[in-house]
Structure formats: C-alpha cells, structure tokens
C-alpha cells in the first residue's frame, strides 16, 4: 500500500522527460528511509514563474533546475546562496517556510568530475561551448582552479559577458568569442580540453555536434555535460579520433548528491545514486 509522501521534490526544465534525476533521488530517499517523492516537471520558459510560485501552495520542498531555466529562475526566488550569487545561475531551490532560496551545485559537481579524472585545470587551456547556466558554473570552476578559458557561444555578446565576469576575478584568464567555424578552428588548435555546455546532442538535437570531426585530435580531452545519450555525436567523433572522452553522468550525480544534502541535511548515498542513474540511463537508451 502506497503512503502519501511527507514531502515533494522535483526537477524543472524543458525538455525534462530524459532526466534520470527522479530515479537517483528517489533511490536515495528510499536508502535513507525518507518518505519523500521526486518528480519531473516540464515547464516552458513562459510557465516558469507560475511553477515557482506554485511551490508554496503545493508545499514542494525543493527543486532542481535544468535547461533552459538556470539563469532566468533567479528572478522568481527570494534569496541566493553566496555561491549561486557569484555564479549567476541556480540549479537547486529550497522552500524554507515559503521563502525560496537558490543554490548552485553544478560548480561542485564539475570540480569533483575534474578531481576524479585527475585533471588539474591550471595545466590546461579550455574551450567551453555555450554561455548558459551550466556554463556559468563550469567557467567559474575552471578559472577558480587556474585554468585558461575561451567561451564560445552563438550569441557573441553572451560569450563576451561571461568571459568578462571571469576576467573581473581572474585577470587575463578568459575570453569570449562567437561560436563559428573559424573561431572554433583557431580556439581548438590552442586548447587541450573541450567542454560542451549546450543542448546540442540531446533530445531533438541528438546526433548533432557543433564541432567538425576534422578539428578533433588524439591529445584532446572532450567533456560533454550531456549524459543522455551516454555518448553524444561529439563524444563518438572524439573517441574515433583517439581523444579521451567524459560524459556528464558523473557530474550529474555529484551535483544531485549535493542537492540531496542541502534538502535533507543528511549525507547522500553517492554510490546508490550513481548505480541507479546508470540503470535508468541504460533503460532510457534501450
């Protein structure tokens, strides 16, 4: 017999049906004997304000925030954790007695991914594709740890704005360029790590890549923040060229574990969450 959950949580984004977050968070709740439920909430940009407002009457205890809402959502929450304020993007919300507080765990998730793969940013030059919410957190992680960063985005102004924010804190460590073939070719020739923070390669954009295979080479490390599919077109092309490839699943689970700890004040069962996320991803790809 099912019981009514003591608290509701969820992930808001568009699209969001591909997410493995419900599987891993619900597994974590069960492991920790918490009678909580985590749901997916598909919300187009025009519906974002209403969904956040509904957290109060529906007593939704917390949310994860994903593409494309991580920056826009800041308008609709009451307070920001200092890290989220510094990053300028939110991926975790807590409903504290009707007050919405925003956090960012993408930063920590990416740092853990770098540590696990023994990547010391200070020794590398990064090409970062995209200038959205995840890119804000990842760019700050790269620059904080001493890496040199080039941000490439289709809207040149967004790339330059993000790079300028990094340069205010880390002089000379970042530049922003329009994402086009010429700039990609020049930037990748000088970079040894590529990070894709765009949705190109997932959902309706699966099978697509922003980078021509001819620009890839064996000495590159290619990181795709996308985890579903497990291997995007970019990662497949990079692997064929002999490059090291890393998908976004590990980062997802680390940031999800940090969100769990913010919501529950309990230590997250990381291994349980990783196993469940891998199983859910395998099921999604069948």
UniProtKB/Swiss-Prot annotation:
Protein name in UniProt:
Shikimate dehydrogenase (NADP(+))
Question: What does the UniProt keyword field contain?
Answer: Amino-acid biosynthesis, Aromatic amino acid biosynthesis, NADP, Oxidoreductase
Q: Where does the chain bind NADP(+)?
A: 130-134, 225, 248
Q: What does the record give as the reaction this protein catalyses?
A: shikimate + NADP(+) = 3-dehydroshikimate + NADPH + H(+)
Q: Does the keyword Signal apply?
A: no
**What GO molecular function terms would the record report?**
NADP binding; shikimate 3-dehydrogenase (NADP+) activity
Matching SUPFAM superfamilies:
Aminoacid dehydrogenase-like, N-terminal domain (SSF53223), NAD(P)-binding Rossmann-fold domains (SSF51735)
| Assembly | Homodimer.
Recorded metabolic or biological pathway in which this protein acts: Metabolic intermediate biosynthesis; chorismate biosynthesis; chorismate from D-erythrose 4-phosphate and phosphoenolpyruvate: step 4/7
Record-annotated residues binding shikimate? 19-21, 66, 91, 106, 227
User: What processes does the entry annotate via GO biological process terms?
Assistant: amino acid biosynthetic process; aromatic amino acid family biosynthetic process; chorismate biosynthetic process; shikimate metabolic process
- Keyword set includes Transferase: no
Which residues span the membrane? none
What role does it play? Involved in the biosynthesis of the chorismate, which leads to the biosynthesis of aromatic amino acids. Catalyzes the reversible NADPH linked reduction of 3-dehydroshikimate (DHSA) to yield shikimate (SA).
Enumerate the InterPro entries for this protein.
Answer: Aminoacid_DH-like_N_sf, NAD(P)-bd_dom_sf, SDH_C, Shikimate_DH, Shikimate_DH-bd_N, Shikimate_DH_fam
Report the sequence similarity comment from the record: Belongs to the shikimate dehydrogenase family.
Q: What class of enzyme is it?
A: oxidoreductase
Residue numbers annotated as active site: 70 (proton acceptor)
Per the UniProt entry, the Enzyme Commission number(s) are 1.1.1.25
Q: Which domain of life is it from?
A: Bacteria
Q: Which organism is it from?
A: Dehalococcoides mccartyi (strain ATCC BAA-2100 / JCM 16839 / KCTC 5957 / BAV1)
């Amino acid at each position: 017999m099912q019981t009514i959950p003591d608290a509701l949580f969820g992930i808001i984004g568009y699209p969001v049906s591909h997410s493995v977050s419900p599987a891993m968070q619900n597994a974590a709740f069960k492991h920790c004997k918490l009678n909580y439920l985590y749901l997916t909430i598909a919300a187009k940009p025009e519906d974002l304000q209403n969904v956040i407002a509904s957290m109060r009457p529906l007593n939704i205890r917390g949310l994860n925030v994903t593409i494309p809402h991580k920056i826009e959502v800041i308008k609709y929450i009451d307070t920001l954790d200092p890290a989220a304020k510094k990053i300028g993007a939110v991926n975790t919300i807590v409903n504290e007695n009707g007050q919405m507080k925003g956090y960012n765990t993408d930063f920590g998730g990416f740092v853990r991914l770098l540590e696990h793969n023994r990547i010391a940013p200070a020794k590398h030059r990064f090409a970062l594709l995209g200038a959205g919410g995840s890119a804000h957190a990842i760019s700050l992680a790269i620059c904080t740890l001493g890496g040199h960063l080039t941000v490439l985005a289709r809207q040149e102004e967004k790339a330059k704005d993000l790079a300028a924010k990094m340069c205010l804190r880390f002089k000379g460590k970042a530049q922003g360029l329009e994402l086009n073939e010429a700039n990609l070719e020049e930037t990748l020739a000088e970079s040894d790590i590529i990070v894709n923070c765009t949705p190109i390669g997932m959902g309706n954009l699966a099978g697509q890549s922003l980078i021509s295979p001819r620009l890839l080479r064996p000495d590159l490390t290619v990181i795709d923040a996308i985890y579903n599919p497990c291997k995007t077109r970019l990662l497949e092309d990079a692997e064929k060229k002999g490059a090291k490839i890393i998908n976004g699943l590990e980062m997802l689970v680390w940031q999800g574990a940090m969100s769990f700890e913010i919501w529950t004040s309990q230590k997250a069962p990381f291994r349980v969450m990783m196993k469940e996320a891998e199983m859910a991803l395998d099921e999604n790809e069948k």
